[in-house]
Each structure stands twice: as C-alpha cells, then as structure tokens.
C-alpha cells in the first residue's frame, strides 16, 4: 500500500485592528456605533478601577484571595456581542464580561469576601456562576448549546477559559462534542501567557492555541486580545456563525496577565519585569483611549469625567456591599440549596448546629 | 401485569418518561443504534430519534459535563456510563459541578440529571467491570445515590430519579439485569427517593442491604426461617444516600441484632455509615456487635475468584448465627 497524503489546510489568522498607538486599520473597521464604542471604553475603565480597588481591599484584609484581571479588559468586546438570551459561561478572570452582562460589583465582592452570595446570579441574567476547576466549564457550554439547538432557540453559549485550560482533558472533550454535534458554542480562550508560574510555551508545544481547532474541524482564529475592536469583530463573526447554525468556533485572545495569578502569588519569582513592561506598552485601555481621542469621541475633560464617574460607581458598590455585610449572615443558611428539599439526615445536622449556636449565645 | 426482567423494566421507565416529557433525553456510549451494551436502551432511538437518544463520543467526563449543560437549560438528561468502573472520569464533573450548582447559585440553577451505571460483580467480566464503589458518590454532598434490587423497584425508582430536581446516581446491579422476572405494572409507578423498605418482617435479627446483595440476603432469610425457625427482618435501603435510617434503627431496637451486607469493600463502605447510625440511635437496644458481611478491602478479583469475594448466603448465614449466639 502506498503512503498517501491527506491534505489538511491549517491557516491560523491573526486579527488586530487597532495597533499599539491606537491607529485603526480602516479595511478591518467593524464599524461599531459611537455610543457602543464609548460604552466599551467605560466598561474597560470600570473593570480596571474595580480591579485596582479590590487589590487594595485585599491588602487591607477586607477581602480574601482574588484573581486580578488587569490587562484583560478588552474581553468585554466579546461579551458585547452576546444577546441577553445567550449564555456566558465564565471561569474566574471574566469579571469585566460578567459586569457587562449585568452582574453587580457587590456580587464580585461577596465572592472574594468569602460570602456564598457572590454566586447567586439574579433571574434574567444568563451567566453561570464562576467556575474554578480549570477547563471544566467548557463542557457546560456545549451542553447548553445542544439544548438550545434541541429547543430550536437561536441562542449561543460563550465559554471563557485560559491558556492553561487547553491542557485539560475536559477542554478537548468539549471541543470534540461541540464539533460532532455542531453546537452553537463559542470557545473563548484568554491566552494571557501565564498559568500561575508556567508560561504559555510550556503549556503547549503548538505554535498557536487557535490551531487546536483544526483537530476538531472547526474554525479557529487568533485575535489581538488587547484590541477591543478585534475582539468584538472576531467574536461577532463566531457568534453570528453559531447563531445561524454554523457550529462552534475556537477563539484565542492573545493578551497578557499584567498582574499576579491571584493575590497569593508573586510573579517576580517566575517572570521578568522586562516582559511585563513590554506588555504594558500594549495596554488595551491606553490604546483604545488614543483611538477614541483621535476620533474626537473623547477629550481630556471627557476622560477625566468618566474616570471620576467610574471611581464613584466602584465606591458606591463597595458601600452597598459593606452595608449588606454589616447586617451579618446567618450561618445556618449554609444548609440551604444543598438539595431542592432538605433530606431528614441533613435537617438533623442543621438542628444540631442550631442548638450549639444558641447555647453559645447563652 | 407482564413479567419482565430488570433490563426491560429500566427500558420501560425510560420510554414512558420520554413519551411523557420531551425534556428527557438519553445519552451515552452505544446507547443509540446498539441499544446499550446490556440492551437497556434497546429500541429507544427508533421511537424517539437520534436527537433524544444520543450516541456520544467515548468520553465519560464529556458525557457528564455535557449533561450538566443540558440540565442547566432545562432538559432532563439521563446519561449512561457503560460500566461504573469507567465512571471515575465523570466524577470530577459530578462532584465539582452537578452536585454544587444549586448550592453555588443559591437555588437559581439546578442539575436535574440522572447518571446511570451498571455496577457490581457476578457476570464473569474483565477487570474494571465488576466493582462496587457507591460510597464515592454517597460521600458527595448534593448527590443522591439510588440502587434498585428488582425489576419493579428499578422501574419505579428510575421514574422518580428522572423527575427528581437534583442529580441522581443510579447504580444498576448488573448481576440482576436478567436474573429474574417480576410483575411490573404498565401504568405509572414511582417510589420515593430517600426511603428504605422492609421487604420481609421478622423479630429475631435485622438484615440490612441493597442492590445486588439483596438476593443472597433474601435467600439466607428464607433458609433461616425454613431450617432454623429464625425470622429475619430484611431491609432494602433502595437509596444509599441521603440515607434513611428510620426503618433500620427502628428494626434494630426491635430485634437487637443486626447484620449489614454489601458488595463494596468494607472499610469506609456504606456499612460503616449504617453501623455508625445504629450506634447513635439504637445503641442501648443492641444485644450483640453488629456484623458486616461485605467485599474485602482489595480490588475485586477476576471471575475465577469472585464467588469467594462476593458476600454469598453462606457468609451471611454464618454472621447471623454468630450474632444470635453472642
């Protein structure tokens, strides 16, 4: 038998629309309306300020370990493409997207402050709660997609995960299921170059993460993850395709974790300052701001006013959160929502704790 | 009432629930065209089509996580693990997400799925095809672990499991799949999850078991009665977790003597929990130490040695006699 070649074409596109100086590639302009451009800018700025504030709160001991998102704010470009009926399936570095989709800042503070309430997503918001085991949530977005298709709903599930997640089995199982069943799922990989201390180069031998789509015969694309216009344009293409029955897409957002993995680690131990400085030049907010100023959509006064405005919004959210936690929590409600109906053996344990607590009070 | 075996009874539960409720979907490896390696899902694909009876890629974690996503959207997936020995891939999804999403979201989301898996020895199978690891699931807060012991209760419990708003692990004793037939009514029948049953009344000793071990237990109870005039009260747990201890602790207060039987390894097995609850709730009524007749703390051997591993009537009878003579 001869050796025969099966020709597979693998061409991974890299899309960047705004360069580091904020200059637009006109041919690629996604023509986003001005008011949406400003909303995106404001959402990125809000996420940055909130992130900075949480770092302060963590250092002051007011919240526990938290995972900063600094540098990854352009992800809102992807969330902005979704309709309210679509589903956002986040991991733990999607605060900007979650806020865009209606989650409150208090809710984020609840989670990092150690309150279960952070996961209590209000009715009407189709965000799943944060999923911490890396990569495991990818499968949920595929099941959601299958169910949407089964019900004849023209909705889409967008799942976020990091570069480290592409090493997990669940990611590959999810990609495979999504491709086999052609589910309306958009895989949004935030390649921020570091999985705690392990660099992207040690995570996978592949040149790009987007090329992993080839193995599952689905479209894969790399986007400049620090360019909100590219993120928006690439996500829109994938979401439109999924919505019209064209199946799943893998998107690799090439971005950078400018801060630590969580407040429990020190990146100086494993990466150089120089590398961080290089990426700071590509800051997604600075670049976008330059572009908007260039288009006269933002002025010095406008930037200042908006910054003041988002800082106030963060402060007000923090105040609301403090007021709510000030009321204290009832430890006995830890037993709630374990099951739809509490089994007798669990009820007995709750009563046991109740007695202990009331004895302590006396 | 037609007499059917457990495979047919489970098939009946699935097909009737699918008929009633279009949110019920069946998925797993070979469950469609092939009808499942044990033929449990035989014919379903012809009746309900490939969108509802889904042959999935071979990936247990994938099947479980995919089912979770479907359930979050309001479907009621019934997924099959081809053998419980391969379900450990799925354990992460069940432990980390299926069991917690209701809790994590404060009741906003729920995962009304069923994970079915044939478990246990007695069918002369290869390695990984005969084990009994229900304790893994039973130890996980947020899951329910149900194990039927007859065609009729398998059908009724599976209907309840499908309708349950929380994730249910449904372990099917494969040794009983075709072991005997029973009258199973065609009309709807359910059994409450979380409730055990007294299947034989007696005053001298209490035998507590579930699943595949119910057969040797009932055999031993008949022999005790016929040959020795000893009347054993037999309790079938039906749900391992959350455990219903009301019936068995009550029975222990009456008889004062208890033997617990299961195939699972002894240490940290469901029997350990049963004994703990007996000590907590019936200690002063016990006339003898509680005995456990179980699998040993080893991997279940390949089938030339499994008869000696599995708790059979002889071992049960010996334990009962020692308990009575104490």
Where would I find each of the regions flagged by the language model?
Chain A
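Short, histidine-centered active-site or binding-site loop motifs used for metal coordination
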Residues: 21, 92-94, 189-192
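Structural signal for conserved beta-strand scaffold positions within catalytic alpha/beta enzyme cores
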Residues: 19, 90, 222-224
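Short, well-ordered beta-to-alpha junction loops that form the rim of enzyme active sites
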Residues: 92-93, 253-255, 326-328
């Amino acid at each position: 038998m001869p050796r025969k070649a099966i020709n597979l074409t693998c061409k991974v596109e890299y899309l960047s629309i705004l360069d580091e100086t904020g200059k637009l590639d006109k041919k690629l302009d996604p023509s986003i309306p001005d008011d949406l451009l400003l909303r995106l800018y404001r959402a990125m700025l809000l996420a940055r300020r909130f992130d900075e504030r949480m770092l302060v709160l963590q250092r002051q001991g007011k919240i526990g370990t938290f995972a900063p998102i600094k540098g990854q704010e352009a992800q809102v470009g992807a969330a902005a493409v979704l309709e309210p009926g679509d589903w956002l399936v986040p991991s733990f570095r999607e605060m900007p997207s979650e806020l865009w989709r209606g989650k409150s800042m208090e809710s984020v503070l609840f989670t990092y402050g150690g309150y279960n309430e952070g996961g209590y997503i209000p009715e009407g918001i189709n965000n799943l709660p944060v999923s911490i085991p890396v990569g495991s949530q990818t499968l949920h977005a595929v099941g959601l997609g299958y169910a949407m298709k089964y019900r004849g709903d023209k909705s889409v599930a967008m799942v976020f995960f990091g570069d480290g997640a592409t090493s997990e089995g669940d990611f590959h199982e999810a990609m495979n299921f999504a491709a086999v069943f052609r589910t309306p799922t958009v895989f949004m990989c935030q390649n921020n170059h570091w999985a705690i201390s392990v660099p992207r180069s040690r995570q996978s031998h592949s040149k790009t993460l987007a090329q992993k789509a080839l193995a599952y015969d689905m479209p894969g694309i790399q986007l400049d993850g620090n360019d909100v216009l590219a993120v928006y344009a690439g996500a829109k293409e994938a979401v439109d395709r999924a919505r019209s029955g064209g199946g799943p897409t893998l998107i690799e957002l090439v971005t950078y974790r400018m801060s630590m993995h969580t407040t429990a680690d020190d990146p100086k131990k494993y990466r150089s300052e120089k590398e961080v400085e290089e990426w700071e030049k590509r800051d997604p907010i600075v670049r976008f701001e330059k572009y908007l100023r260039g288009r006269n959509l933002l002025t010095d006064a406008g930037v200042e006013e908006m910054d003041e405005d988002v800082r106030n919004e963060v402060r007000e959210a923090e105040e609301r959160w403090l007021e709510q936690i000030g009321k204290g929590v009832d430890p006995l409600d830890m037993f709630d929502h374990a099951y739809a109906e509490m089994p007798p053996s669990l009820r007995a344990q709750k009563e046991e704790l109740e007695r202990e607590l009331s004895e302590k009070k006396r | 009432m037609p007499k059917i075996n457990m495979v047919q009874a489970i098939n009946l539960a699935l097909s009737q629930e699918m008929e009633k409720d279009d949110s019920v979907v069946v998925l797993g490896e070979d469950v469609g065209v092939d009808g499942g390696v044990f033929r449990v899902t035989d014919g379903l694909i012809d009746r309900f089509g490939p969108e509802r009876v889904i042959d999935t890629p071979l990936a247990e974690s994938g099947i479980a996580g995919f089912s979770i996503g479907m359930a979050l959207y309001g479907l009621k997936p019934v997924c099959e693990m081809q053998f419980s020995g391969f379900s450990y891939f799925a354990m992460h999804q069940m432990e980390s997400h299926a069991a917690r999403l209701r809790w994590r979201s404060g009741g906003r989301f729920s995962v009304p799925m069923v994970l079915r898996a044939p478990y246990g020895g007695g069918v002369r199978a290869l390695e990984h095809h005969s084990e009994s690891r229900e304790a893994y699931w039973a130890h996980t807060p947020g899951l329910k672990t149900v194990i039927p012991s007859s065609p009729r209760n398998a059908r009724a419990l599976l209907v309840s499991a499908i309708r349950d708003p929380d994730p249910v692990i449904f372990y099917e004793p494969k040794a009983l799949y075709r072991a005997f037939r029973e009258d199973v009514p065609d009309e709807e029948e359910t059994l409450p999850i979380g409730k055990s049953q007294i299947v034989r009344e007696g005053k001298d000793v209490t035998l507590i078991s579930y699943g595949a071990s119910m057969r040797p237990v009932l055999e031993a109870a008949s022999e005790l009665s016929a040959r020795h005039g000893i009347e054993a009260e037999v309790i079938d747990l039906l749900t391992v977790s959350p455990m219903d201890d009301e019936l068995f602790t009550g029975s222990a207060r009456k008889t004062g003597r208890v033997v617990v039987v299961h195939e699972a390894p002894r240490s940290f097995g469901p029997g350990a929990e049963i004994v703990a609850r007996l000590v907590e709730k019936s200690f002063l009524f016990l006339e003898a130490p509680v005995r456990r007749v179980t699998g040993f703390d080893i991997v279940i051997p390949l089938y030339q040695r499994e008869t000696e591993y599995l708790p059979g009537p002889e071992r049960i009878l010996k334990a009962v006699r020692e308990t009575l003579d104490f």
